[in-house]
Regions:
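Acidic/polar low-complexity segments and flexible, solvent-exposed patches
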Residues: 38-74
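A short, charged, amphipathic alpha-helix used as a generic interaction element across diverse proteins
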Residues: 4, 14-34, 57, 61-67
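Short linear sequence elements within intrinsically disordered, low-complexity coil regions
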Residues: 9-12, 17-18, 27, 50, ...
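Short aromatic-glycine-(Arg/Gly/Cys) micro-motifs in beta-strand/loop hairpins
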Residues: 1-9, 28-50
């Protein structure tokens, strides 16, 4: 049976509290709710902006985060 996991910057966490602490420690990072490792991502949540979005997959969510990071990096 697969269990829900929380993905933040390459790491998986079993509970939201730990994932949120890590996301806040590393900066403005999304928390992805997944069903098992590298499976379908259900939701992504940004603790800083409190934005919640439905995602299609972990890879799609990672790609979106990388694009956001790149766009922020070039703006500065």
């Amino acid at each position: 049976m697969k269990e829900f996991m929380y993905y933040v910057n390459g790491l998986y966490f079993a509970n939201l509290k730990t994932a949120r602490k890590h996301a806040q420690r590393v900066g403005d990072s999304d928390i992805l709710l997944t069903l098992g490792d590298y499976d379908e991502t259900i939701l992504s949540y940004n603790p800083m902006s409190e934005r919640l979005e439905r995602q299609m997959s972990v890879n799609e969510a990672k790609e979106k985060l990388l694009q956001e990071y790149e766009s922020k990096r070039f703006i500065k």
